[in-house]
Every structure is written in C-alpha cells, then in structure tokens.
Amino acid sequence: MHQWRKHQQSSVHFVPTMGALHRGHGQLIKSVHGFGRLQPAAVLVSVFVNPLQFGPAEDFDSYPRDLEADCELASRSGASALWAPSVDQVFPGGASSHFRIQVPSHLQAHLCGASRPGHFDGVVTVVARLLALVRPEVLVLGEKDWQQLVILRHLVAQLGLPVRVHGIATVRDDDGLACSSRNRYLMTQQRQQALALPQLLARAARESQDGRAVDLAGLRCAWEQLGLEVEYVEKVDAFNLQPLHAGRKLCLLAAAVRCGETRLIDHTFLMSRQPIVAIDGPAGAGKSTVTRAFAERLGLLYLDTGAMYRAVTWLTQQHDVDPHDPVAVKTILENLELELEPSQSGAQTVRINGHDVTEAIRSPEVTSSVSVVAAHGCVRKALTAQQQRMGVRGGLVAEGRDIGTAVFPDAELKVFLTASPAERARRRALDLDNRGFPVPDLAELETQIEERDRMDSTREVAPLRQAEDATELISDGMTIEEVIETLIDLFRVQVPEEVWPTAGR
C-alpha cells in the first residue's frame, strides 16, 4: 500500500468495503467520476472483513468472501486498484496491541448501535486505521448504512482528519430491496417476504408527506404479521440520531428485521418540503457567482434576492424617487411585478414591471443606493413576502443579507460567505472592468465597501448579521471552484443524496 500510494499523482478516493461486492458497491466506485470539476482521481477499493465489528454470535466466519469476483466487479466499475489487507497488515502485532476508538454513547444509543453493542466502536477503529494507511483525499461511503455514515462524519470532524466524506444514495435492486452482501443468504421465497421492509417504509414516507403521523407500532405489527422478526423500528433525528416525536425538517425512519437467519436494515427520510439553502454575507463576497454555480451543480432553483433589491432601486431612479424617502418609495411598490428566470446562457434574467434590468442593476449608480432602499421596512416586507412564496415548496438556494435570519430561518443549510474588504475591493474592480464601467482606485473601493458594511449591519430593519446556526466561510485565497466544493460538502452533511440527488449523478 505504501508503494502504491507513493506513486499516485492524482487525488485518491477511497471506498472501504468488506467484500462480497454488489451493484451498490459498484455505484460507489462509479460515482467518484462525478465528483466536482477537479482533476481525475484514483479510486482505491479495500476488501477487509473487519473482525472488530462482529459480535460473538454474528456471521464473521460465514460472511461471504469471493476476492476474484470482487476484483472483477471493482475493475468493471472503474476502480484503479483493489487492496485486500490481512488482519496483520491492518493491525501489526494484533488488534489488541492497538488503540481502540469509542463512539460517543448518544450516537449509538439507538438503531443498530443499541442492538449491536460495540459494533460501531469496531467500525470507527478500523476505518481510522485504514485512513491512516491509505491517506485518501476523499472517503466514499453509502447512505444505506446511515448511522455508520453519520458516526464516521463525526469522527472525521472531531479528530480533524484531512479527508472529505462523500455519501452515495442507497442503491436498490429492481424489486426495491436495498443492495446488501447479506441478500445472498435469502432464499427465493424469503426475498419476496423481505420486500415488505422497503415497501412499508416507502408507504409511511408517502403518508408522512400527506400529513399523516408515522405509526411505529403499526409498522412493527405489519412486518410481524408477514413473518419478519422486527429488531427495531424508530424515527430519529437524521443527524444526532435521537428519537423524535414532534415534527422536524428532516428525520430518519429506520428499521432492522430478520427474515429467517438474515438480518436486513433499511430506512427512508421524512421531510415536509424540499431543502432550502440560505447564503448570506456582505457585498462583494462573491455570493452571486458561487451561489449560481452551486445551484446549477445541485439542480436547485437560484433565488437572487440581491437582484430583487437592486431592481427596486433601479425603479426608484427611473421614477426620480428619493431613495431616502420611505413614503415615496412605497408608492412604486404598488402592483410591483418582479420576475427572476433562467436565461439560455445559464445566468438569471431579472425583469421588473416588464423591463429587462439584468445588466442595469449592476451599475455603480444602483450599487451606491441599494443599501438605502433595502433598509426601508416597506421594501423588505414586500420582497420578503415574495421570496417566501417562491420558497414554500423548497428546492432552492437564496443569497442576500438576511436570508438565514429573516427570509428562510428554517433553511437546512445556512452559510455566511465573506471575505476581507481588500479582497472584496479587488473582486469589485474586476467586475466593473468586465462590465465596461469605470474602475475607481482600490483604496476608494475598499472604503466604499466598509461603509456599505456599516450601513447594512446597523440598519434598523433586517440588518446584516450571521445567523447563530450558520457556518462562516471566509473565501480569501480560495478559487471559485474551491468555494463551490466546500458549499457542496456542507450541503451534503445536512441533506442526503436520497433526499436531493446531485444533478446528473
């Protein structure tokens, strides 16, 4: 492994498995080629049946092993290499001579953690060891083992491990059963019986969308009547894995059953609407550029709220309205028609009262007055109401100054995107030059930006501020692609692929 790793010029994406590879593993491998827009990666698949994650009465000895078939499937799916280390290679001197990692109790108090004591301690201990040996840039895991994925994300974050974690949606066979190495234990009749697991979970998810409460006892009874032995069926917070009783933006409905001697797990996510992303930050931080690209990458609707305020500012100038006079400004808001729609170029066309103002709203004249206009309560009330109507079904990303605090306070992901005044002045100069406008001195631009920050953060109505639950992202020194990739990583921590698939994957 050391020699192979030393000769890799590109980044390494690591897919750890216990072998007995199937379609689900194949999809993990293939998905690597759809990550981001950076240079191609080497894909390493490991096959290691981890003795630390099996209990005394579990199937370690009988777990299916077929290395030749695994090599064939991995190669066919696009893997660069397959590594099948022995226990001695992973734990020189024996596992007992190495440190063990203990998962925090709250992360394994429910679901599989409760019924398989010590299982996740064994998982994280081995994964940490494999990461140390492989040193990958990206760790690729399936969402099928959701509790495991959540725990490993906590491991990476809390230990500061230098690896990104990518989760891939559960892959299902044509009949709906989630792909699993243990499915091969099932006889034909048992497989038909096992289909009740995904079918009833899917039905519960549909009923939840219609506003009906999930009946955990009813699910258990239904499976038992069909001959399945229910180990657990629980509704938990999708991220802290604690039981839920009241409604929440996203929760996990998960179950484990036995069909004969075969243990099967499955889950579904319950969500009242599609996800919303709120990106706030000061002027010139690059919000529009990265948010537009981020939305396109994930297939989300891009809601440029800043353009809406700029359009109203442009309208005040066309009507010779004093931007400081809220009464006068309010008069032009009557019968306001504001449209945001994608154009063929991929940018967003902005129309106000039938006028295409896409370019006009980026002029220095509009920029110098937009903070004044946006500070009026009548303007913010009118536009916030429009924005919230656009977001009632979710499936969008919005950027502005108060998206996470006032417009969409229940957004799944909130990011405060910022940069130093000097960096923002440099970007503003480039933008003005590209648009054909005169470019002031950088020091003057920096002063203007600092004054804009002061005005935005001290206004009485919806001041610029970071939401308490927002993640701050300082973009100094980062390329646009790096910012987008960071946003995608943050999104995926909060929104599974199964809930909102990455566009084109």
From Swiss-Prot:
<feature type="active site" description="Proton donor">
    <location>
        <position position="25"/>
    </location>
</feature>
<feature type="binding site">
    <location>
        <position position="171"/>
    </location>
    <ligand>
        <name>ATP</name>
    </ligand>
</feature>
<dbReference type="InterPro" id="IPR027417">
    <property type="entry name" value="P-loop_NTPase"/>
</dbReference>
<dbReference type="InterPro" id="IPR003721">
    <property type="entry name" value="Pantoate_ligase"/>
</dbReference>
<feature type="binding site">
    <location>
        <position position="53"/>
    </location>
    <ligand>
        <name>(R)-pantoate</name>
    </ligand>
</feature>
<feature type="region of interest" description="Pantoate--beta-alanine ligase">
    <location>
        <begin position="1"/>
        <end position="268"/>
    </location>
</feature>
<dbReference type="GO" id="GO:0036431">
    <property type="term" value="F:dCMP kinase activity"/>
</dbReference>
<keyword id="KW-0418">Kinase</keyword>
<dbReference type="Pfam" id="PF02224">
    <property type="entry name" value="Cytidylate_kin"/>
</dbReference>
<feature type="binding site">
    <location>
        <position position="148"/>
    </location>
    <ligand>
        <name>(R)-pantoate</name>
    </ligand>
</feature>
<comment type="pathway">
    <text>Cofactor biosynthesis; (R)-pantothenate biosynthesis; (R)-pantothenate from (R)-pantoate and beta-alanine: step 1/1.</text>
</comment>
<feature type="binding site">
    <location>
        <begin position="179"/>
        <end position="182"/>
    </location>
    <ligand>
        <name>ATP</name>
    </ligand>
</feature>
<comment type="function">
    <text>Catalyzes the condensation of pantoate with beta-alanine in an ATP-dependent reaction via a pantoyl-adenylate intermediate.</text>
</comment>
<dbReference type="GO" id="GO:0015949">
    <property type="term" value="P:nucleobase-containing small molecule interconversion"/>
</dbReference>
<dbReference type="Pfam" id="PF02569">
    <property type="entry name" value="Pantoate_ligase"/>
</dbReference>
<dbReference type="InterPro" id="IPR011994">
    <property type="entry name" value="Cytidylate_kinase_dom"/>
</dbReference>
<dbReference type="GO" id="GO:0006220">
    <property type="term" value="P:pyrimidine nucleotide metabolic process"/>
</dbReference>
<keyword id="KW-0067">ATP-binding</keyword>
<dbReference type="GO" id="GO:0015940">
    <property type="term" value="P:pantothenate biosynthetic process"/>
</dbReference>
<keyword id="KW-0808">Transferase</keyword>
<dbReference type="InterPro" id="IPR003136">
    <property type="entry name" value="Cytidylate_kin"/>
</dbReference>
<dbReference type="GO" id="GO:0005524">
    <property type="term" value="F:ATP binding"/>
</dbReference>
<keyword id="KW-0547">Nucleotide-binding</keyword>
<keyword id="KW-0511">Multifunctional enzyme</keyword>
<dbReference type="InterPro" id="IPR014729">
    <property type="entry name" value="Rossmann-like_a/b/a_fold"/>
</dbReference>
<feature type="binding site">
    <location>
        <position position="53"/>
    </location>
    <ligand>
        <name>beta-alanine</name>
    </ligand>
</feature>
<keyword id="KW-0436">Ligase</keyword>
<comment type="function">
    <text>Catalyzes the transfer of a phosphate group from ATP to either CMP or dCMP to form CDP or dCDP and ADP, respectively.</text>
</comment>
<dbReference type="InterPro" id="IPR024894">
    <property type="entry name" value="Pantoate_ligase/cytidylate_kin"/>
</dbReference>
<comment type="similarity">
    <text>In the N-terminal section; belongs to the pantothenate synthetase family.</text>
</comment>
<comment type="similarity">
    <text>In the C-terminal section; belongs to the cytidylate kinase family. Type 1 subfamily.</text>
</comment>
<dbReference type="GO" id="GO:0036430">
    <property type="term" value="F:CMP kinase activity"/>
</dbReference>
<protein>
    <recommendedName>
        <fullName>Bifunctional pantoate ligase/cytidylate kinase</fullName>
        <ecNumber>6.3.2.1</ecNumber>
        <ecNumber>2.7.4.25</ecNumber>
    </recommendedName>
</protein>
<dbReference type="GO" id="GO:0005829">
    <property type="term" value="C:cytosol"/>
</dbReference>
<keyword id="KW-0963">Cytoplasm</keyword>
<dbReference type="GO" id="GO:0004592">
    <property type="term" value="F:pantoate-beta-alanine ligase activity"/>
</dbReference>
<feature type="region of interest" description="Cytidylate kinase">
    <location>
        <begin position="269"/>
        <end position="505"/>
    </location>
</feature>
<dbReference type="InterPro" id="IPR042176">
    <property type="entry name" value="Pantoate_ligase_C"/>
</dbReference>
<feature type="binding site">
    <location>
        <begin position="142"/>
        <end position="145"/>
    </location>
    <ligand>
        <name>ATP</name>
    </ligand>
</feature>
<keyword id="KW-0566">Pantothenate biosynthesis</keyword>
<feature type="binding site">
    <location>
        <begin position="18"/>
        <end position="25"/>
    </location>
    <ligand>
        <name>ATP</name>
    </ligand>
</feature>
